[in-house]
Amino acid sequence: MRWSMLVLLLLSCSQTFAQRPGDICPQNPHHGQDVTANTVPTVDPKLFNKRRYRSPRVLFSEHPPDSEPSRSRTKRKAGPPQHRGVYSVCESISHWEGNKTKATDITGNEVTVLPDVIINNSKKKQYFFETTCSSGRTGGSGCLGIDARHWNSYCTNSHTFVRALTSFKNLVAWRLIRINVACVCVLSRKSWRA
């Protein structure tokens, strides 16, 4: 008898989680209604107290941010730096992006990023802190400081996933979307056969 209750509980829990494609954004009392392009969803401010919805690369604000996101963790240093000059092999540009309309979510779907939301009765915009390769170094020119006689190299954007308010198939939800976070160097050894 106890095993059957446990199995029923397990089945009901797994069915509940299987039906959740994303964390549905609580809106007005008309929760299940279709979302049109003109509606701005209302978000409960208590949602931002949850750690899973906070990211230093995503910001909801009425005005564009002035500075880079604050770092929550600092690296420990044992002593003075051993190397005098530390240089990046790929030049990059970091900025707050406020006009993102489309993005790719973690399942590969192209979703619509909601530009505006209402939090505490004020309209706020979603901003994403992105780092991209400088246009001059992307592609065939190679990375800085790499020996071109022995190595093929190029700079490319690296990505991560952050939570954002999105719309997909008329359902507004928190989804993980891909944004650019770094410019990295890709190396391959040149063939010795010429």
UniProtKB/Swiss-Prot annotation:
Gene3D superfamilies: Cystine-knot cytokines. Keywords: Cleavage on pair of basic residues, Disulfide bond, Glycoprotein, Growth factor, Secreted, Signal. One of its GO terms (cellular component) is axon. GO terms for molecular function: growth factor activity; nerve growth factor receptor binding. Residues 54-84 are annotated as: Disordered. Residues 1-18 form the signal peptide. It comes from the Eukaryota. Nerve growth factor is important for the development and maintenance of the sympathetic and sensory nervous systems. It stimulates division and differentiation of sympathetic and embryonic sensory neurons. Belongs to the NGF-beta family. This is Nerve growth factor. It comes from Danio rerio (Zebrafish). The gene is ngf.
